[in-house]
Amino acid sequence: VRIDIWSDIVCPFCYIGGRHLQLALERFDHAEEVEVVWRSFELDPRPVEDPHADLTEQLAAKYGMSRDQAEANQQRVGEAMEAVGLEFNWRDAHPANTFDAHRLAHLAAERGLSDQAQTAFKKAYFTDGRAIGDHQVLRDLAIGIGLDADEVDDVLSSDRYADQVRADESQAQVYGITAVPTFVLADQYSVSGAQPVDTLVDVLDQVWSLTEKTPLVPVSGAAGESCGVDGCD
């Protein structure tokens, strides 16, 4: 079973949802037969005017709430992260454009380092307060998970993997995905939001039962003559 996850690096519930899925897979009997594919989604594709701006203040303005309300929301998100072993130092977080991070995530996926990239980028943003749109920060993180420095430089100095990012976003539009995280299982079953671990375990069991290939059951007792790879009889 393949699970495609539409996610953005700066989405806190994507971070939580990814952790919930990891915990759910630890309880799923067929986890070794699950392939997780991270897909790109930009919550705000616009260029960041001030990468050092106060994220909480920006969120307050965006959603028409007071500073106190925005801080309370950030605190609740931080508590939700803490409950699953993640850390959100929201006072140190700043706005970021994630397009280049997504491009590097596609490189990482090609090199078998997809999960490592997702974890490194999200931890850098949420826990360490690093500027995830900055090329030097991205370079350090990408090399840190084992990507080749020259290849990382080539990506950051070009538009390599831009088409793959846009293709993911176009597919999200086809599916009608407007919020993340969104999990698409076996190309036809979707789950939206950072669902509880128990819910994800149930979903995995249900999708497995619907897609599992079972042996054919003969409807007659006698076998007629036939040909196989070793000849006819």
Whereabouts are the PLM-identified features?
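A broad, low-specificity signal for short, low-complexity segments enriched in glycine/proline
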Residues: 1, 50-51, 64-68, 141-146, ...
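Residue-level preference for long, well-ordered alpha-helices that form the structural scaffold
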Residues: 10-13, 66, 70, 161, ...
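Glycine-/small-residue-rich active-site loops that bind phosphorylated ligands and cofactors
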Residues: 12-13, 96, 191
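C-terminal cap of thioredoxin/glutaredoxin-like
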Residues: 5-6, 16-30, 106, 110-233
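Short active-site neighborhood of thiol/selenol oxidoreductases, capturing the structured segment around
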Residues: 1-12, 17-21, 36-39
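Structural alpha/beta surface segment adjacent to cysteine/selenocysteine redox centers
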Residues: 18-125, 227, 232
